[in-house]
């Protein structure tokens, strides 16, 4: 059974890629997140049709 390329080259690109610092994420509470999704999906579509 063959492989998809040489195992000696495994991880080559990942090792060469410079490490970037992690970005801060906005962690909304679930209620607020659901409300924002509702506004984007339903309220804006309904107002666009009217």
From Swiss-Prot:
Ranges that cross the membrane: none
Q: Which domain of life is it from?
A: Archaea
Ordered alphabetically, the record's keywords are: Ribonucleoprotein, Ribosomal protein
Region Disordered, residue ranges:
1-28
One Pfam family cited in the UniProt record for this chain: Ribosomal_S30
- Regions of biased composition (Basic residues) lie at 11-28
Q: Would you tell me the Gene Ontology cellular component terms? A: ribonucleoprotein complex; ribosome
InterPro entries linked: Ribosomal_eS30
The answer on whether this UniProt entry bears the keyword Ribonucleoprotein reads yes
Would you identify the family this protein belongs to, as annotated?
Belongs to the eukaryotic ribosomal protein eS30 family.
Its protein name is Small ribosomal subunit protein eS30
Biological source species? Aeropyrum pernix (strain ATCC 700893 / DSM 11879 / JCM 9820 / NBRC 100138 / K1)
């Amino acid at each position: 059974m063959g492989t998809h390329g040489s195992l000696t080259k495994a991880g080559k690109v990942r090792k060469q890629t410079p490490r970037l610092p992690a970005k801060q994420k906005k962690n909304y509470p679930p209620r607020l997140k659901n409300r924002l999704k509702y506004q984007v999906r339903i309220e804006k579509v309904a107002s666009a049709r009217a």
